């Protein structure tokens, strides 16, 4: 997780988005694949977590809540992490809305991606069998005058403490253990993520 927003690093581009054509009473209607999946209450969180992506994910969750506040939302995560403030806007929206948000890790959920994976509704946090999860402490890289660096160092320590508190809440592990385990990058397989309490189960096939 990065404390600062280095926007030039976070510019994922999709060269080709498949289109889906559906037959309706009024003729054919085409959707891009992600819009079609949104109709099934599926949201994709892929690539770096940054402000633009976070706004889109939050907006989709709010839209689905308005459509049906009782029906689950499915958030598929394949992310190396990103900016903390952007990730926290997604986290707060997940906790705020009425529908349960089921989180599914495909590929990887690292750093802020892992945090959002763990923030899903209890009993509905899932890893696919060959996915991996990585947790660590927030990263900082502020430059400037000594006094400003000190201010930002104090702030990132506050953020670190808050993130540890929330991870402890969602995993059920002691905050001291979370703090120790996130001092360095810690990679976990799907099985290890279940054992640690980051997710609840592994899905190999649909029921």
UniProtKB/Swiss-Prot annotation:
Biological process according to GO: protein quality control for misfolded or incompletely synthesized proteins
Active site: 111, 136
Matching PROSITE patterns: CLP_PROTEASE_HIS, CLP_PROTEASE_SER
A GO CC term attached to the entry: endopeptidase Clp complex
This protein's UniProt keywords: Cytoplasm, Hydrolase, Protease, Serine protease
Cysteine-cysteine disulfides: none
Signal peptide, first to last residue: none
Enzyme Commission designation: 3.4.21.92
Catalytic activity entry: Hydrolysis of proteins to small peptides in the presence of ATP and magnesium. alpha-casein is the usual test substrate. In the absence of ATP, only oligopeptides shorter than five residues are hydrolyzed (such as succinyl-Leu-Tyr-|-NHMec, and Leu-Tyr-Leu-|-Tyr-Trp, in which cleavage of the -Tyr-|-Leu- and -Tyr-|-Trp bonds also occurs)
Record carries keyword Kinase: no
Superkingdom of origin: Bacteria
Enzyme superclass (EC): hydrolase
Primary localization: cytoplasm
Molecular function per GO: ATP-dependent peptidase activity; ATPase binding; serine-type endopeptidase activity
UniProt keyword Protease, yes or no: yes
Subcellular locations according to the entry: Cytoplasm
CDD domains on file: S14_ClpP_2
The protein's role, per its UniProt record: Cleaves peptides in various proteins in a process that requires ATP hydrolysis. Has a chymotrypsin-like activity. Plays a major role in the degradation of misfolded proteins.
Subunit and partners: Fourteen ClpP subunits assemble into 2 heptameric rings which stack back to back to give a disk-like structure with a central cavity, resembling the structure of eukaryotic proteasomes.
Protein family: Belongs to the peptidase S14 family.
Record-linked PANTHER family: ATP-DEPENDENT CLP PROTEASE PROTEOLYTIC SUBUNIT
Protein name per its UniProtKB record: ATP-dependent Clp protease proteolytic subunit
Organism placement in taxonomy: Bacteria, Pseudomonadati, Pseudomonadota, Gammaproteobacteria, Enterobacterales
Name of encoding gene: clpP
